[in-house]
């Protein structure tokens, strides 16, 4: 098949997901193009597909847009696969334009069911968009009833896919930069975009008890802020935990990410709500147990007492005890590391590509065995 992915954001989880899936689909005999934003963070990493940097949130790029249109006319995609939920108006505009250029079937992976910043028109826009998609891919079973209820998507047009390690290429191609951490520290890492729904304030509230029981613990909160972090900084100062809890409010490089994940003993995801997490999949890829809340489909990935611990959201006391337990119980931790590595090995991009390919075949009417012969 000839497949055109559109993932406008050039950085973070959605485009990393698309990069991995695109490579795996090429391995299965398909021809793939990824259209993304200017400043594509994976531009210098090995890839097997064509990448076009078209979108720019700061200024128009008419020449790049013309190249994109020309590529669509010459490539003649059979599948156009939209990725991400942050730009519904853009997706509708692209749908309206691209459907005039050929006969491609449109499919959609929202990643997040709703955007980080929900605006008044978004629900209507998504209803319009979903109604025009031939198939929808989700990354957590819990999201299926939400999409059916809010956007009237028929159940038989939905496929739930797992998420494999988004950043496996980091371990293959990047030398990690070790963070400045005291050698004896037991590092608890909370990684990813900093948003109100991520429950960072709950983690900070849990920190004093963790540090009381495990004096050599070090909590690292690393990620680009999508919120005002002044309240978090005040909370940290009021608790008097500077130096023992570090807030690193920036989007870090892949080398820095590798350093943080390697240094961590465990990952903690204290979300209050959500849809899925690429950070969780990356944690498993690095062999790290995860403490997560029972939201966002996390309980579909984390097996309680086996690959991590599940806790209720917004409960600092329970979160603190879970962190303490994994920091102090070395036997439990060792068992979990083994289980995490086994779980990570069972979810591959090849498997996800095969499942995706089967739905593509259904959509274009050529069945599941649609590689190679239809890609020419």
Give the location of each predicted region.
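Acidic anion/phosphate-binding donor-loop and adjacent secondary structure
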Residues: 30, 148-149, 162-181, 259, ...
């Amino acid at each position: 098949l000839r497949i055109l992915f559109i993932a406008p954001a050039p950085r973070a989880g959605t485009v990393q997901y698309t990069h991995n899936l695109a490579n795996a689909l090429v391995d299965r005999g398909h021809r793939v193009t990824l259209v993304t934003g200017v400043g594509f963070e994976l531009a210098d990493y090995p890839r097997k597909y064509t990448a076009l940097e078209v979108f720019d949130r700061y200024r128009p790029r008419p020449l790049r847009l013309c190249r994109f249109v020309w590529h669509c006319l010459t490539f003649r995609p059979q599948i156009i696969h939209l990725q991400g939920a942050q730009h519904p108006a853009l997706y509708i505009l692209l749908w309206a334009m691209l459907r005039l250029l050929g006969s491609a079937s449109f499919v959609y992976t929202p990643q997040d069911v709703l955007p980080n910043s929900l605006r008044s028109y978004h629900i209507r826009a998504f209803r319009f968009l979903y109604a025009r998609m031939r198939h929808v891919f989700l990354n957590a079973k819990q999201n299926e009833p939400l999409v059916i209820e809010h956007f009237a998507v028929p159940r038989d047009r939905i496929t739930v896919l797992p998420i494999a390690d988004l950043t496996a290429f980091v371990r293959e191609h990047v030398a990690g930069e070790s963070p400045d951490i005291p050698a004896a520290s037991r590092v608890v890492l909370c990684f990813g975009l900093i948003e109100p729904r991520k429950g960072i304030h709950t983690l900070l509230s849990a920190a004093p008890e963790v540090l009381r029981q495990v004096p050599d613990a070090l909590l690292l909160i690393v990620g680009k802020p999508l919120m005002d972090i002044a309240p978090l900084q005040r909370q940290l100062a009021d608790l008097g935990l500077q130096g023992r809890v570090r807030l690193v409010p920036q989007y870090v490089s892949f080398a820095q990410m590798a350093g943080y994940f390697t240094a961590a003993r465990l990952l903690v995801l204290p979300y209050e709500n959500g849809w899925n997490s690429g950070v969780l999949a990356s944690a498993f890829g690095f062999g790290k147990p995860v403490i997560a809340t029972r939201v966002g489909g996390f309980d579909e990935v984390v097996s309680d007492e086996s690959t991590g611990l599940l806790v209720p959201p917004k409960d600092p006391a329970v979160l603190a005890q879970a962190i303490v337990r994994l920091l102090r119980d070395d036997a439990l931790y060792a068992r979990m590391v083994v289980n995490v590595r086994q779980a990570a090995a069972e979810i591959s991009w090849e498997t996800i590509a095969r499942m995706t390919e089967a739905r593509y075949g259904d959509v274009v009417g050529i069945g599941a065995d649609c590689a190679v012969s239809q890609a020419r």
